[in-house]
Swiss-Prot record:
Disruption phenotype: Leads to sensitivity to osmotic stress and shows morphological defects when grown under hyperosmotic conditions. Shows also a dramatically reduced ability to accumulate arabitol in the mycelium. The lineage of its organism: Eukaryota, Fungi, Dikarya, Ascomycota, Pezizomycotina. ATP binds at V26, G27, M28, G29, A30, F31, G32, L33, V34, K49. Its cofactor is Mg(2+). This is Mitogen-activated protein kinase HOG1. It is found in: Cytoplasm; Nucleus. Interacts with the HOG1 pathway downstream tanscription factor MSN2.
Length: 357
């Protein structure tokens, strides 16, 4: 039985196994407090995210189960990876992942990014999205603060707590407003992997400009700011709007012409402008895909089609429509955690045999 130690962080009890030391608060992630710590087994620094009271409601239990399943399934260099998971005696759940020194939000608020960094970061975002989308997963909440970066400029996408299946009836109030695709704001249903491309486009623009591209004060203002730059959406996009109120609002807006992005991004390369134009398209079906973006001229310095993997298998979303009591989610969660540790132990055994230990 693992030995647990307690520490108080921001008035919150962290109850972790004695394998981890030197707890330091890092910040709040989606639905939990995050600390850095030293993993005494591997001698590496790690991030530990506490999911508070995961079994307090069926909704929270399901959300935690979903995040755990996603972290276990997604294995890619540009996606955050799970290194440990445990349930404490107080029945809080702790996810342990690799620790990266900073995130894109902090980088963007500290100094302008040079061209080669913008290219390399965008390349890694697109490489990660190609993999995630191939697994049948939509992130839904892509923004600078959940794109982690280390001192070698390695980039990893994190916070998959909101991620959902590619589902034709998706419902909507998800990502942080500035980075939210128009189809989430307008239709409240029917969206897919393209929402992540829009968000990545907003992040790309922010890397080029040093400030958010569409800093809306609310939903209405947000959409208005988007149309000032990109013009009025085409009729075939407007006609997909399901809500009568939203449709009335969009039709009441003055007709606007799309502005050339080169006028706004005066210092950007023509190839950067071209890629951005293809990402920020109202019609999701006409938006560039992650795979297409990787092959775009702007990302040529880093593009390697032999090293941009897709998922070996689709993520199993069969649990996602289940409406189960907390106790059932708890049993399923314990089962997933046991499976994770058994798989890890098996891998370690294979490593030991391979190295002759």
């Amino acid at each position: 039985m693992a030995e647990f130690v307690r520490a108080q962080i921001f008035g919150t009890t962290f109850e972790i196994t004695s394998r981890y030391s030197d707890l330091q608060p890092v910040g709040m992630g989606a639905f939990g407090l995050v600390c850095s710590a030293r993993d005494q087994l591997t001698n590496q620094n790690v991030a530990i995210k506490k999911i508070m009271k995961p079994f307090s409601t069926p909704v929270l239990a399901k959300r935690t189960y979903r995040e755990l399943k996603l972290l276990k399934h997604l294995k890619h260099e540009n996606v955050i990876s799970l290194s440990d998971i445990f349930i404490s005696p107080l029945e809080d759940i702790y996810f342990v992942t690799e620790l990266l020194g900073t995130d894109l939000h902090r980088l963007l608020t500290s100094r302008p990014l040079e061209k080669q960094f913008i290219q390399y970061f965008l390349y890694q975002i697109m490489r990660g999205l190609k993999y995630v989308h191939s697994a049948g997963v939509v992130h839904r909440d892509l923004k600078p603060s959940n794109i982690l970066v280390n001192e070698n400029c390695d980039l990893k996408i994190c916070d998959f707590g909101l991620a959902r299946i590619q589902d034709p009836q998706m419902t909507g109030y998800v990502s942080t407003r500035y980075y939210r695709a128009p189809e989430i704001m307008l239709t409240w249903q029917k969206y897919d992997v393209e929402v992540d491309i829009w968000s990545a486009g907003c992040i790309f623009a922010e890397m080029l400009e040093g400030k958010p591209l569409f800093p809306g004060k609310d939903h209405v203002n947000q959409f208005s700011i988007i149309t000032e730059l990109l013009g009025t959406p085409p009729d075939d996009v407007i006609n997909t709007i399901a809500s009568e109120n939203t449709l009335r609002f969009v039709k009441s807006l003055p007709k606007r012409e799309r502005q050339p992005l080169k006028n706004k991004f005066k210092n950007a390369d023509p190839s950067a402008i071209d890629l951005l134009e293809r990402m920020l398209v109202f019609d999701p079906k006409k938006r560039i895909t992650a795979t297409e973006a990787l092959a775009h001229e702007y990302l040529t310095p880093y593009h390697d089609p032999t090293d941009e993997p897709i998922a070996e298998e689709k993520f199993d979303w069969s649990f996602n429509d289940a409406d189960l009591p907390v106790d059932t989610w708890k049993i399923m969660m314990y089962s997933e955690i046991l499976d994770y540790h058994n798989a890890e132990a098996g891998m370690q055994q294979m490593d030991d045999q391979f190295t002759g230990q």
